């Protein structure tokens, strides 16, 4: 069992990053690969979940042990597979997800990709007791740290702009969409969502 991978971040994609260590490149599927764009070419460490299918052996990577643990708990929910778990963690911070489960907020959970009312209710039923003892401050991701809501919005905006810069967009192009993305980040949109919105705005010119 591989518990974590530490090495040089060789490159990243919309679904995964590749970490090279010992002459081997490990492909790690992540909730939001672009959060690691600032580490490209540098040493980094991700905690992993090893998933075996009939047709593939896959590694999933997470910034913290707590995020990985939450992913594994999501996999215990009937109807949620690895892709669904990643989509949920990409759309919300662990803090937001745990709070939604603890507060039995079905409306919030149904905003996640592929999550209907029945699945949202199942998430609450299956995870509420398992998340007793989890506190928001204990499960924040590395990107969020112990930041206030305002600081988290700024952090998400900066990471999204960094990712768009890495994709080849100029400062002038990004300046035109900065205010729009800033407002979206203040509304609670995460890094991946901001990147997608930014790309849509840039393609429209």
UniProtKB/Swiss-Prot annotation:
The gene coding this protein: ruvA
One cellular-component annotation, GO: cytoplasm
Entry's localization field: Cytoplasm
Keywords, comma-separated and alphabetical: Cytoplasm, DNA damage, DNA recombination, DNA repair, DNA-binding
Matches recorded under Pfam families: HHH_5 (PF14520), RuvA_C (PF07499), RuvA_N (PF01330)
Principal subcellular localization: cytoplasm
UniProt entry tagged with the keyword Ribonucleoprotein: no
InterPro entries: DNA_helicase_Holl-junc_RuvA_I (IPR013849), Hlx-hairpin-Hlx_DNA-bd_motif (IPR003583), NA-bd_OB-fold (IPR012340), RuvA (IPR000085), RuvA_2-like (IPR010994), RuvA_C (IPR011114), RuvA_C_sf (IPR036267)
Renumbered residue ranges of the record's region Domain III: 153-205
Recorded family membership: Belongs to the RuvA family.
Family annotation (HAMAP family): DNA_HJ_migration_RuvA
SUPFAM superfamilies: DNA helicase RuvA subunit, C-terminal domain (SSF46929), Nucleic acid-binding proteins (SSF50249), RuvA domain 2-like (SSF47781)
Keyword DNA damage: yes
Residue segments, region Domain II: 64-142
Quaternary data: Homotetramer. Forms an RuvA(8)-RuvB(12)-Holliday junction (HJ) complex. HJ DNA is sandwiched between 2 RuvA tetramers; dsDNA enters through RuvA and exits via RuvB. An RuvB hexamer assembles on each DNA strand where it exits the tetramer. Each RuvB hexamer is contacted by two RuvA subunits (via domain III) on 2 adjacent RuvB subunits; this complex drives branch migration. In the full resolvosome a probable DNA-RuvA(4)-RuvB(12)-RuvC(2) complex forms which resolves the HJ.
Protein name: Holliday junction branch migration complex subunit RuvA
Function: The RuvA-RuvB-RuvC complex processes Holliday junction (HJ) DNA during genetic recombination and DNA repair, while the RuvA-RuvB complex plays an important role in the rescue of blocked DNA replication forks via replication fork reversal (RFR). RuvA specifically binds to HJ cruciform DNA, conferring on it an open structure. The RuvB hexamer acts as an ATP-dependent pump, pulling dsDNA into and through the RuvAB complex. HJ branch migration allows RuvC to scan DNA until it finds its consensus sequence, where it cleaves and resolves the cruciform DNA.
NCBIfam families the UniProt entry points to: ruvA (TIGR00084)
Molecular function terms from GO: ATP binding; four-way junction DNA binding; four-way junction helicase activity
UniProt-annotated stretches for the region Domain I: 1-63
Domain notes: Has three domains with a flexible linker between the domains II and III and assumes an 'L' shape. Domain III is highly mobile and contacts RuvB.
GO biological process: one example: DNA recombination
Spans annotated as Flexible linker: 143-153
